[in-house]
A protein has these predicted regions:
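Hydrophobic alpha-helical membrane segments
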Residues: 1-217
Length: 217
């Protein structure tokens, strides 16, 4: 597996389906950014990071599950309707949110110990979302199967994921410095929404990896 080919194919898919992905995910991404802004206003700049995590757990499972279902349908040649995908995503939300909460806590704990354990868990759990959504398994089963599917594939997944995540992290950091809290709220909402939408790119890349590595023969 060549990471450059995976990235090329993923960018191509994202580009040709950009309008459909925008219509499907952007409204929820904007709602998430607005919710983060409201939480920050209520709790102040020194609010616990858990408030931010809670907002993410409310919205992230919805637009990510919808995107995964969209990716699967388009790969099979179908043109899925957005409301149908969102309906399925809403049905999956309780299980997805539970799994996302467990994964987030594990990765945060790993990062707290040292960076490498958190990074290891992030890679080993990278297919869990796709397993839960596409194979309709329980959160713990999805996490366990993700560990199994990534055996012997840690480094290819790591290199591919870092190749897309590092530029996005840099962009997020630079935009945070350029558009500080002194900027008007609409500007911050716009920047946060754009950054959050671009974070969907790793979902597309990991889906491509899952198609290559994780789907049954």
């Amino acid at each position: 597996m060549n990471p450059l080919i995976v990235l090329r194919d993923s960018f191509y898919f994202f580009r040709i389906n950009l309008w459909a992905i925008l219509r499907l995910c952007l409204p929820l991404v904007v709602c998430e950014a607005l919710a983060r802004e409201l939480v920050a206003r209520v709790n102040g700049p020194d609010a616990s990071v858990m408030y931010d995590v809670a907002v993410g757990l409310l919205f992230y499972p919805l637009y990510t599950a919808a995107l995964i279902l969209f990716l699967d349908a388009r790969t099979d040649g179908y043109e899925p309707q957005g409301r149908h995908l969102l309906g399925k995503a809403l049905h999956l939300w309780p299980r997805f949110a539970l799994m996302a909460a467990i994964s987030t806590l594990l990765i945060m704990f790993g990062m707290w110990l040292f960076v490498l354990p958190g990074l290891y868990l992030m890679i080993k759990l990278s297919f869990a979302e796709y397993l839960l959504v596409l194979r309709n398994v329980t959160p713990l089963q999805a996490m366990r199967e993700s560990f199994d599917l990534t055996k012997g594939k840690f480094w290819p997944i790591l290199f591919t994921l870092l190749a897309i995540m590092i530029p996005l992290w840099l962009l997020d950091g630079l935009s945070a410095m350029a558009w500080a809290d002194t900027q008007p709220t609409p500007v911050r909402l716009l920047v946060d929404s754009v950054n959050s939408f671009l974070q969907l790119l790793p979902t597309v890349v990991l889906f491509r990896l899952f198609m290559l590595m994780g789907k049954p023969d």
